Design a protein with these regions (language model features):
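Conserved HGGG/HGGXW glycine-rich cap/lid loop of the alpha/beta-hydrolase fold
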Residues: 9-67
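The conserved SAM/SAH-binding core of class I Rossmann-like methyltransferase domains
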Residues: 55-57, 98, 122
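Residue in the alpha/beta-hydrolase core beta-strand immediately N-terminal to the catalytic nucleophile
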Residues: 58, 94, 117-120
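Conserved acidic catalytic loop of the alpha/beta-hydrolase fold
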Residues: 75-93
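Conserved alpha/beta-hydrolase "nucleophile elbow" surrounding the catalytic nucleophile
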Residues: 93, 97-99
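Flexible "cap/lid" loop of the alpha/beta hydrolase fold
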Residues: 103-106, 110-111, 116-149
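Helix-loop "lid/cap" segments that line or gate small-molecule binding pockets
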Residues: 151-156
Length: 156
């Protein structure tokens, strides 16, 4: 599989990294938290791109996309996705989100339904109320040093 395009788009004050693979009906891949394109979808990409135009993004503070000074919220990330789709000329797409990406896909469908044809959601929460308090506490105190050496960081 070859990458058709590897680029950055300026959306909502963010310099968002994305890749486009293949041709056909657009499919947007939205990765999980503390992950990126390769760690969430690397093994799936070649098969998905055989019959689809796969648009894989790296959201705020993940992979090649730097963090900016704004809350990391589903609503903000959903607005980034629709801004990217507009910028690259995609009117409507199927969204496949995993974990954090599933929440972003869900918010995209709720807030910007005109962009969404179909949703595939894996391991999704609607909001943080569905998460264990211990998990939220761990996330709140996590640092880059805590993640050093983990598979998520080695593969970025």
């Amino acid at each position: 599989m070859t990458i058709s395009k590897r680029s950055y788009a300026r959306v909502n004050g963010l310099n968002m990294y994305y890749e486009i693979h293949g041709e056909g009906q657009p499919l947007v891949l939205l990765h999980g938290a503390l992950s990126a394109i390769g760690t969430s979808f690397g093994k799936l990409l070649p098969d998905l791109a055989k019959e689809r135009q796969v648009i894989a993004v790296e959201m705020q503070g993940h992979g090649h996309t730097a963090d900016i000074d704004r809350p990391l919220r589903y609503e903000n990330l959903a607005a980034d996705i629709t801004a990217l789709l507009t910028q690259i000329g995609i009117d409507q797409a199927d969204l496949f989100g995993w974990s954090l990406g599933a929440g972003v896909a869900l918010q995209t469908a709720i807030r910007h339904p005109e962009y969404v044809r179909k949703l595939v959601l894996a391991s999704v929460t609607y909001n943080s109320g569905g998460l264990y308090p211990e998990l939220l506490a761990g996330i709140a105190h996590a640092t880059p040093e805590d993640m050093a050496g983990t598979p998520s960081m080695r593969n970025i």
